[in-house]
A protein has these predicted regions:
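Extracellular/luminal ectodomains and secreted, surface-exposed scaffolds of diverse proteins
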Residues: 468-490
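A generic structural signal for beta-strand entry/edge sites
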Residues: 325-327, 353, 431-435, 448, ...
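Intrinsically disordered, low-complexity acidic/polar segments
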Residues: 40-42, 169, 326, 374, ...
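Surface-exposed loop/edge segments in extracytoplasmic proteins
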Residues: 339, 345-348, 460-462, 468-473
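Accessory, solvent-exposed terminal regions and/or long lumenal/extracellular loops of proteins
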Residues: 367-468, 489-490
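Catalytic-domain carbohydrate-binding cleft regions of carbohydrate-active enzymes
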Residues: 1-362, 368
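Generic alpha-helical propensity signal that fires on short helical segments
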Residues: 13, 47-53, 122, 176-180, ...
Length: 490
């Protein structure tokens, strides 16, 4: 009947779900299944759910509560109830996870279909109302998914994404901003939303690129959304339109070169982004940071409304968010020198507002004078391509530190020390000293690295590695072909 019955496979579209997952996994494609907590009246598993007392109740507790749902009235699993969680977990394991996927996508988990604020929740046997407990359901739905993933795939790192969450959701799931409107205003709102979530403790956040309600995005809007989106902690072009069509980048042929360049930047920056995720997991620092978080002594940063932000502590990002823009107004925080990453690292003194010319290819980004950024050209497919060569971009006007973090990307062996954590300490001065201290038992796939040190005032006289002078090359091709050495790029 073409209705949405969660956990029930459409055998016309997916005659062999397990075989489908096996084939996708063999191709290196992670498939994530969209799950919603509402149960329609004709759901094939409704009797089993009823027998296990899995639903939210009416205010007097005499029966199951029915509310608005996709395709008609539905009941809603009570995630404050041990029975509700266990029943959901059993269905999730049998019909989804054991078929071959290791990921869970919890949608509509804000429980807006339960409109009666007095509807009754179990709350571990203590009873309570939706008015009191609604905010807990999304977290407990993610918690239940995490338990299920651990039970089906012990030793594997769980990946869960939630549309909603309360304080603490970052312990269980990545989140996104829900169904957003397709317009230029939303692009700006999305940046503010991610920044706000980050300083609220939820760093692993993103928004649907291209919009999820409204007409198909115009080509310039989609491009600017992607150019910003590739730097979001969660990057996903998940765009649908009111005419029931979807948005894909290859539909915008004129913009494809710029879209490819943006995607490529995301992959180049994965070592830096992954390290920022690690940092966030340790001390809660967001990946996207409002200017005032990095520059609390600069009053201008508190009032800046230009949607400029820091990506980690090293890179200032000023995405182009105005239709037809020819320039981008950017405030560069005081106390630092800033290097334009798209203009041969042209330096700018901090504490000033600049007007930067932009075109469709522009993704304005500035390197801070204490920056340490790890990048690579190796990765085109995250699950297949090993990291062989690492580029480390350093601006050493002042002392700085950075932790480059790496592990296998999927298991929980990092909890037992199977990781590679390299502390990079830069001491600025007439002689710039860069110290690497490695920790952990992970056998890194990195075989070589290039340190790119920005020096606009004067070139290096010599370079040494462990007190051994390295050979200087005059011709770049000779330097690139050598096992070691240094080269000054004029």
């Amino acid at each position: 009947d073409n209705l949405r019955y969660v956990f029930n496979w459409n055998k016309k579209r997916f005659p062999e779900p397990k075989q489908f997952f096996d084939e996708m996994n063999a191709r290196g494609i992670n498939v994530i299944v969209n799950l919603k907590p509402g149960i329609l009246a004709r759901h094939p598993y409704k009797q089993w759910l009823e027998e296990h007392n899995a639903f939210i109740k009416t205010p007097d507790g005499s029966g199951d509560y029915y509310g608005r749902w996709w395709g008609g009235p539905g009941r809603f699993v009570d995630f404050t109830s041990p029975s509700g969680r266990d029943t959901w977990k059993a269905l999730l394991k049998k019909h989804i996870l054991e078929m071959g996927t290791k990921t869970v996508w919890n949608d509509n988990c804000e429980m807006d279909g339960v409109e009666d604020r007095e509807a009754q929740c179990d709350f571990e046997g203590q009873k309570g109302t939706m008015a009191e407990l609604k905010i807990l359901h999304s977290n407990m739905m993610a918690y239940t998914a995490k338990q299920a993933l651990h039970e089906v795939y012990p030793g594997e790192r769980p990946y869960i994404i939630n549309r909603a969450g309360y304080a603490g959701i970052q312990r269980y799931a990545q989140v996104w901003g829900g169904d957003n409107l397709t317009d230029w205003r939303t692009l700006k709102f999305n940046i503010a939303t991610i920044l706000g979530m980050g300083i609220s403790g939820c760093a692993n956040m993103g928004c649907d690129i291209g919009g999820f309600a409204g007409p198909a995005p115009e080509e310039e809007l989609l491009l600017r959304w992607i150019q910003n989106g590739v730097l979001q902690p969660r990057f996903c072009l998940n765009s649908a339109n009111n005419d029931n069509t979807v948005t894909q980048p290859w539909m915008y042929e004129k913009m494809l070169p710029h879209i490819r360049a943006a995607y490529r930047l995301r992959y180049r920056m994965l070592p830096y982004l992954y390290s920022l995720f690690y940092e966030s997991s340790q001390d809660g620092m967001p990946i996207w940071r409002p200017l005032f978080l990095e520059f609390p002594q600069d009053p201008q940063c508190y009032g800046d409304q230009s949607l400029t932000f820091m990506l980690g502590s090293s890179i200032l990002v000023a995405s182009v968010v105005e239709k037809g823009a020819k320039t981008r107004t950017i405030y560069l925080p005081n106390g630092s020198t800033w290097y334009d990453m798209n203009d041969d690292f042209r330096p700018y003194t901090g504490g000033q507002t600049i007007e930067l010319p932009v075109d469709l290819a522009s993704m304005p980004m500035f390197l801070r004078d204490t920056a340490v950024v790890t990048m690579t050209e190796d990765i085109h497919h995250i699950l297949k391509d090993p990291l062989r060569h690492l580029d480390i971009l350093i601006a050493a006007e002042n002392d700085s530190t950075f932790v480059w973090y790496d592990d296998d990307g999927h298991s929980e062996q990092y909890k037992d020390g199977v990781y590679a954590k390299t502390a990079i300490a830069v001491t600025a001065g007439e002689q710039t000293k860069i110290c690497f201290v490695a920790q952990g038992n992970y056998q890194s796939t990195v075989q070589s690295l290039t340190v790119k040190l920005i020096s606009k005032d004067k070139g290096a006289y010599w370079v040494a590695l462990d007190n051994t002078l390295l050979k200087q090359f005059i011709i770049q091709d000779d330097w690139e072909a050598a096992d070691s050495g240094w080269y000054y790029d004029l």
